[in-house]
Amino acid sequence: MSIQSGEILETVKMVADQNFDVRTITIGIDLHDCISTDIDVLNQNIYNKITTVGKDLVATAKYLSAKYGVPIVNQRISVTPIAQIAAASKADSYVSVAQTLDKAAKAIGVSFIGGFSALVQKGMSPSDEVLIRSIPEAMKTTDIVCSSINVGSTRAGINMDAVKLAGETIKRTAEITPEGFGCAKIVVFCNAVEDNPFMAGAFHGSGEADAVINVGVSGPGVVKAALENSDATTLTEVAEVVKKTAFKITRVGELIGREASKMLNIPFGILDLSLAPTPAVGDSVARILEEMGLSVCGTHGTTAALALLNDAVKKGGMMASGSVGGLSGAFIPVSEDEGMIAAAEAGVLTLDKLEAMTAVCSVGLDMIAVPGDTPAHTISGIIADEAAIGMINSKTTAVRIIPVTGKTVGDSVEFGGLLGYAPVMPVKEGSCEVFVNRGGRIPAPVQSMKN
């Protein structure tokens, strides 16, 4: 395959001018061989395994970044859901396990560690319940541990008892962490995937190898620049530009993943194609949608534009790699996207519109700040709505919502770094308390009649 000089310059520009980066190299680590009936032994086993398997990750990422001239922003670890690993200990709290994860992750220098998780789509074991009830204190006493709960799936339906508990857990976490920051590290899923390299929802699935490398790329700025510089007029042509750009982005991620796998002697798992924005100007998913012809993200037509973007990214990425997995689409985290922040501040991008957008994009209601006095049952209702979209449409959906204590609509909250800042958005006045308190399970949907 011949490479033109223009294509080489394009790749250089992607990094130099358009905020292209490999967002994360994540090592997934299986912890089943760490299980012990003694929680102290369990913690020591977990620490030893993480620090052994992950010891060279940061140095490898730095070497590859220098070798290829591509920034590798984060190095992360994901582990088997702790509710499964800690069950044999019969402990009444798993906060010490979260602290062990935090300590191990800091020892090897990674940015985040995920997997303080419970998979409860069909029911909660005593261990699942202990883990979920440990989340607020775990988020308060750790710095880089991320937590997730899978409350539903297309096969199992939605576990409304877990949804209720998740809402209460998020509310409690918001109350005991500064400006609700602990909630930025909690994701509630429907149809969670087992090979996600992105935080805060990463965990290492039970069907995975002992250790595996998953890579997440990011290039909203590259896609926007490609559209700006193209002469595409119809949406068919726009989709083609996005597809070709996604191909180029994916090839870089594939190269980095394969090289990291070889150097670390850990199998290469998947490449997640998700366009993950940052608060930096020029690195926004919202601005891509506006480049397609919307005056502001959130206006009518936004869901259609996002559907086009998401599908084109997947098509381009699939041609570039045989190892596409994870979430693979476009993320729409409000606080992490400069264009989304502006649209929300203008009052055009609302919670309702974001919910509609999640029906066609990669994940869900992400990094949304709501008033601190939002009741737990309202948070549970938002989670249930989002889970229903995922369940019916056979896709991953998720909620990462932050009730900010002491703040109300019109205020904003600063999270810093990649997490950015967010305007506090209004929630509905009506109550869903009776509905949420009913509990039980919303049955799995029929598959044969799709309307």
UniProtKB/Swiss-Prot annotation:
Pfam families: DUF711. It comes from the Bacteria. Homodimer. Belongs to the UPF0210 family. PANTHER family: UPF0210 PROTEIN MJ1665, UPF0210 PROTEIN SPR0218. This is UPF0210 protein NMCC_1554. It comes from Neisseria meningitidis serogroup C (strain 053442).
